[in-house]
């Protein structure tokens, strides 16, 4: 067990709650102590829903452990079924309750209810939240479709032609507390509709047990988030013959590839790629003169597997950035992330320690960080611009407005969210450069908010001091002229310049670093 201030994922029962809360006519009885009810806040505070999750907690206390906690479980299950009248009941236990070994799922199945009961056995001490969501979704589909899967013939993706209707697809994977899932679904449905393709079921988000039984009415499945839906898609393919897409439509190129993959599976004619590219502003901007400032910017990427891989591809192929770091906290996606990192000639970082990620960020010296809310805090400490691309996230990353990550509009949102921090970084550097000019006025407001630029001065001074405060490295001394020249370097690349200059001085055997050494090192490293 490891003590930490932050964690990227909660225990697996939180993943189960995400799936249950995303669906209708379903209820989750969770065998858990009082302290585990904190998860409700995730949905009301961060997701900002107007209703609490459909979860009943047994909320046993220390004094209950001396009695029969199994009776407590059965009483809560009975009350939940009578009060909420769900069409499907999920039963599981939290990490604490797992130690008691009451086996609430087995108890529920022996109580004689005439509704499907899904027994969730989620190993709390070896698995985490995304795995828990994936396993819950899979168990729901398996329970509700098991009999039907044995009766139907294998599904032909082109059967829509013989049936005389438009092709239909299922969109699988979006859940509450996922990164922009609600808006992604709207964007993907819009794109599919433009291609003459209907949506049969979206699940888990907004679906019911009745909808799950209709999954086989579709021709293919869209696996929108691999962390959540891939296991279910594989089961549907194996047992029902349903093909599924693997391309994640984040970014212009991947959206085009996604549309082509859907067309190929459904045997539809392929679309004109040039026409599709004009549906977003990102391709135009990346080719414009204004974007030259951004070419070659060093970017560090960390998040869940789906968004991290997509972000790295967009950064390299669509915006011309140099990806200097790529990683994920999701062990289930480690293989795919390692493969993506290998294509970029870098080593993938697979860890659930935010401190390891922060150390990797320091060593990579990026000019932009694309990560979770934890990387936003780390980047702020290091003075590096950051944009959040993945869960875990805070309330500011769940906008009330329409703000997808997928499709054409998603590319526009990404274009704004990634480019603006870099442009603002340039503005801060210009303020830093000219703040000593006699015409510079302290009272002018900063783009950072309603604070005067005096606060910004202090912040920039902190960045400068944190990057040049070390006077010696080994036997090398920074002279006054060297330190003065270093302060002229933009704060978001100053650490890299300082490190390279010290390496250069060590390799040349120089006892001190002055302004000339800085120029020589710059010429040496290019």
From Swiss-Prot:
Disulphide bond pairs = none
Among InterPro entries, the record links this protein to: ChlB/BchB/BchZ (IPR050152), LI-POR_suB-like_C (IPR013580), Nase/OxRdtase_comp1 (IPR000510), P-CP_red_C (IPR042298), Protochl_reductB (IPR005969), Protochlorophyllide_Rdtase (IPR016209)
GO molecular function terms attached to this record: 4 iron, 4 sulfur cluster binding; ATP binding; metal ion binding; oxidoreductase activity, acting on iron-sulfur proteins as donors; oxidoreductase activity, acting on the CH-CH group of donors, iron-sulfur protein as acceptor
Task: Write down the required cofactor(s).
Answer: [4Fe-4S] cluster
The UniProt transmembrane annotation reads none
Pathway involvement of the protein, from the record: Porphyrin-containing compound metabolism; chlorophyll biosynthesis (light-independent)
Catalytic-site annotation from UniProt? 290
As to how many cofactors bind and how, the note says: Binds 1 [4Fe-4S] cluster per heterodimer. The cluster is bound at the heterodimer interface by residues from both subunits.
Provide the E.C. number(s) assigned to this enzyme.
1.3.7.7
Q: Which Gene3D superfamilies match?
A: 1.20.89.20, Nitrogenase molybdenum iron protein domain (3.40.50.1980), Proto-chlorophyllide reductase 57 kD subunit B (1.10.8.550)
Family named by the database record: Belongs to the ChlB/BchB/BchZ family.
Functional summary from the UniProt entry = Component of the dark-operative protochlorophyllide reductase (DPOR) that uses Mg-ATP and reduced ferredoxin to reduce ring D of protochlorophyllide (Pchlide) to form chlorophyllide a (Chlide). This reaction is light-independent. The NB-protein (ChlN-ChlB) is the catalytic component of the complex.
What does the annotation say about its assembly with partners?
Protochlorophyllide reductase is composed of three subunits; ChlL, ChlN and ChlB. Forms a heterotetramer of two ChlB and two ChlN subunits.
Protein name, per record: Light-independent protochlorophyllide reductase subunit B
Q: Which gene encodes it?
A: chlB
